[in-house]
Structure formats: structure tokens, C-alpha cells
Amino acid sequence: MSQPAKVLLLYAHPESQDSVANRVLLKPAIQHNNVTVHDLYARYPDFFIDTPYEQALLREHDVIVFQHPLYTYSCPALLKEWLDRVLSRGFASGPGGNQLVGKYWRSVITTGEPESAYRYDALNRYPMSDVLRPFELTAAMCRMHWMPPIIVYWARRQSPQTLASHAKAYGEWLANPVSAGGY
């Protein structure tokens, strides 16, 4: 039996203590030996990112999960800084930038609005696939495999049972993320 893929879960929430949904989603992740949970806001409260350390972490893992709330149609500020610093030219892209080739990228995102708000004729004017296009393009730039994102819409308003169901499915996927496909 082969070993499950090594997963680096980059967790970025500036107010983690207030996010019930993200805390529930993290519970199964910390129970898997193949998953490294890396809380960026806990590690870098000053936003000074240790780029060589972060790049070494990326090299050691097969699947990179970016778990965060959707902030202004993007990610929280520290994760954006992390993307700009760590996925640098010569490491992740450009000449010699082949360190992430063939690895997997998966976004796990919580939103404050229902799925129906993400349509051309709705509040946010664009479907979630369009909103997440910059992340998909970043994965392509790094020559990583883009996996369908996991979205928990209207996270604050989900029942404990619904959140538990998402967490269970997420945990099952994390146990064997490459062969399990989407959840």
C-alpha cells in the first residue's frame, strides 16, 4: 500500500478565533499524519515572511491547500504577500523556476454570502470560477495541477450539522488527496 500524498495546508485567517467554519474545517486536518497545518497569521503576525523556510516546506509536500476566507474577491492580505514573496521567479516560475511542477493546488474557501450571490445577474456579478481565476492562473504559472476548489458558501450561517458534513468530507479527501479526486 502506498503512502498518501504529503499535504501542506496553508491556513490564512486574520481572525481565526472568530471563524467557526474554518475552525471546524481544520479539525480533521490536524488528525492526519500526512497533513502539515501551517497557520500563516500565527507564524507571521508581523508579515515578515521567511521565504527560504516557506519554499523548503513547499518542496517537501505534494499537495498544497490554501484555506482562507474570501476577502474582497481575493484572499487575506498575508496570503497575498506570501504568494508574491514565496512563489518567486526562479523558484516557482520563469527560468529555473521548476520547484512546484507537478504538485497539486487546491483552494478551500469560506464565503460570507450564499452561492446564489455568485452569478452574472446577482450581487457579486461573477460566478465563483471567475472570482478564483487569479488563483488558477497562479497555479498554472507554477505548472501545478489545479484541483476544483472546495467552497463553503455563507459559512457563518451554516448549521453545525452542515459544517460537520463539510469537515467530514474534507477530512476524507485529505486522507488521500490525489487519488480521491474532488469532494
Swiss-Prot record:
SUPFAM superfamilies (UniProt xref): Flavoproteins
Any one GO CC term of the record: plasma membrane
Enzyme Commission number(s): 1.6.5.2
Keywords: Cell inner membrane, Cell membrane, Membrane, NAD, Oxidoreductase
Subcellular location: Cell inner membrane
Keyword set includes NAD: yes
One GO process term, biological-process aspect: potassium ion transport
Coiled-coil portions: none
InterPro entries the record matches: Flavodoxin_fold, Flavoprotein-like_sf, K_H_efflux_KefG, KefG/KefF
Class of this enzyme: oxidoreductase
Chief location of this protein within or outside the cell: membrane
Topology class, membrane: Peripheral membrane protein
Catalytic reactions of this protein: a quinone + NADH + H(+) = a quinol + NAD(+); a quinone + NADPH + H(+) = a quinol + NADP(+)
MF (Gene Ontology): electron transfer activity; FMN binding; NAD(P)H dehydrogenase (quinone) activity; NADH:ubiquinone reductase (non-electrogenic) activity; NADPH dehydrogenase (quinone) activity
Subunit structure comment from the entry: Interacts with KefB.
PANTHER family per UniProt: GLUTATHIONE-REGULATED POTASSIUM-EFFLUX SYSTEM ANCILLARY PROTEIN KEFG
UniProt function note: Regulatory subunit of a potassium efflux system that confers protection against electrophiles. Required for full activity of KefB.
Family, as annotated: Belongs to the NAD(P)H dehydrogenase (quinone) family. KefG subfamily.
Name of the molecule in the record: Glutathione-regulated potassium-efflux system ancillary protein KefG
Gene: kefG
